[in-house]
């Protein structure tokens, strides 16, 4: 195991020893291989550079108490990348190739995965890009699929803590656009709203990110920064927005299952109106990086709405977080198919 300060890692790039790379050419993928080269050499006309023909995923590997290593739902990431590839006229990365690449990268870099109990994980970044000679707006002649990894720490230093958010007039995605798939352009478009949200904070009340409303009516919550939103009602309902322009979060669907099957809640996907926040006693944003970010409050049109607390984590949010992370680290039995062991 590498000599790192495992208890104090942030969420930033740290170069590890190996990454996986595969090439698509003449209608088929090669076998792919591990490499120590962290630099890609691609043609200047590559569609990934000019026309945004690229997509990516994010998932984690976890060290369990017995020393074994878990991957959390990599098949779901593979399927989501396939849906994105279809939308951008890119070749699908077969699930077998995707999962094998992730397992090989984790196994080759297992010294970069921190000890059980440190909160550290190995973050994997699979990506697919269009490359090769090109100048016009059309699909690329060749493609690269690659997976690299970085050790990352617990997202919240000192424990789970709420963050505040503010709505933005900017749209994250358009109806029938690319909001429901994981393309880089969605994230580039979010950089300015994120910056503006942070600038509107004060020393007393900071805003972690922007909340995006539906692009058609600007009345319904869609995403919270780069994460999915959920709310907990007084009558034990777990409610999360449903829209074709929301990225289907694997973490969110895992929480929907846990809320219903493990916590006995009514789990609902539906409209969440920004002017009906009073129905929620707790709220959160969920995604791979933080798992759950408790939402302390939301500012909209100059009014600030507080949920359970600006400083304390709500009891249901805490139970959801503990259940999901317990599954990921192997302390709690997982639903069938959720865990893939790295042998």
UniProtKB/Swiss-Prot annotation:
Per UniProt, which keywords does this protein have?
Amino-acid biosynthesis, Aminotransferase, Branched-chain amino acid biosynthesis, Pyridoxal phosphate, Transferase
Q: Which pathway is this protein engaged in?
A: Amino-acid biosynthesis; L-isoleucine biosynthesis; L-isoleucine from 2-oxobutanoate: step 4/4; Amino-acid biosynthesis; L-leucine biosynthesis; L-leucine from 3-methyl-2-oxobutanoate: step 4/4; Amino-acid biosynthesis; L-valine biosynthesis; L-valine from pyruvate: step 4/4
NCBIfam families assigned: ilvE_II, PRK13357.1
EC number per UniProt: 2.6.1.42
Gene Ontology biological process terms in this record: isoleucine biosynthetic process; L-leucine biosynthetic process; L-valine biosynthetic process
**InterPro entries xref list:** Aminotrans_IV (IPR001544), Aminotrans_IV_CS (IPR018300), Aminotransferase-like (IPR036038), B_amino_transII (IPR005786), BCAT-like_C (IPR043132), BCAT-like_N (IPR043131), BCAT_family (IPR033939)
What broad class of enzyme is this?
transferase
Per the record, residues carrying N6-(pyridoxal phosphate)lysine are 182
Taxonomy, superkingdom: Bacteria
What taxonomic lineage is listed for the species of origin? Bacteria, Pseudomonadati, Pseudomonadota, Gammaproteobacteria, Pasteurellales
> What is the name of this protein?
Branched-chain-amino-acid aminotransferase
What cofactors are annotated for this protein?
pyridoxal 5'-phosphate
